[in-house]
Amino acid sequence: MKTIYDSAIEQHYHQQHQHLQRQLDYLPTTFTDDNGVIFKAKADFYDTISNTYIEVKNRQLNNYKTKQDSLNRQSVLRQHRGYLTQLEQLQSGWNHSIYKQLIVQQTLSLLGIDYLIVFYKPTKLSKQAINKMNALGLNYTIQ
């Protein structure tokens, strides 16, 4: 069976970490943003050795605090040409929000489940982004 990846970076990461299990199902709970909106989430991989779900990113996270904030911004951007560029999706997508990732991490932690964001090469993170992730307590690594 051929494994389908969401991005080339996920495929490359998996080739370098073949012991990881590709995750196609939703994480084992639901999550709630600051507006009370319930959402589901997926991780990219599961590490059976460390019992950790792993989300791979190759861009720094955006700062949209709620799913609706993200959708509102995407709606405005979409009005210009009828679609979002890949960069606009990363800069405004809820899936790429530092707050979404933090909600997922904190909720899973309450269930005794570890969740790690891996910023995989050639990710460039600003000092401001690193400071913010550290201040919020986001569990991440840069590889």
Segments the model singles out, each with a brief description of its role:
Residues 1-143:
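Nucleic-acid endo/exonuclease domains
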